Each structure stands twice: as C-alpha cells, then as structure tokens.
Amino acid sequence: MADSPISVAFSKVQDLPEAAKSGLPAAERERADSFKAAQRRDQYLCARALLRALLQRYTGNPANSHELGSDDKGKPVCAGGPAISIAHSGGIVMCAAAPHGEIGIDI
C-alpha cells in the first residue's frame, strides 16, 4: 500500500446491490437507520459499502476488517489505513483512498 497510487470509486446509489449494504457492520447499519430522510440513509449506506469495497481492493484486507471513524471535523478516517474521502450528491457517491497524507474528493 505504501507506494500505491490514489484510487477512486464511484456508484449511483440505485446501482449498489442490497447485499453490499446488508453486509456492512451492525454499527454502520444502525447509524443509517437513525437518518430520518431515506435519501440520506441510502447515500450513507452506499458510501460505506463503496468505501469498504475500495479499501478491500486497495489494501488486500477484507472489507469489514477496516476500522472506520471520523475526525473532530467529521471527515472519515480509516484507523491504521490509507487516507480516505467520501462525497455524495443526489444519487451519486464517490470515494477515494491515498497511501498517506490527506485526500479530498468532491462531486
């Protein structure tokens, strides 16, 4: 991973299989259930599933082995892993990973 290039993935929310979303860790599914707006819930589930798939390809480790969280500003972080970024707008979600430093992605 140390010399890996930046990696980007994107998806339409409607195109992500339900199985990918249902395979997320319980804590992430529970957080999604706390969103009142269905669009926001679907964006969150799609973003997490897409990010975990990207991290699996990027690191070679199982998708659910990555400990994801947020920094003090709400930006997603992967404990002990690459720098990550998530963006969503309407029905599109994008994720990015970089070997070190910071990364930002926007739609």
List the model feature ranges, each with a label.
Residues 1-107:
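Core catalytic alpha/beta fold that binds nucleotide/phospho-ligands
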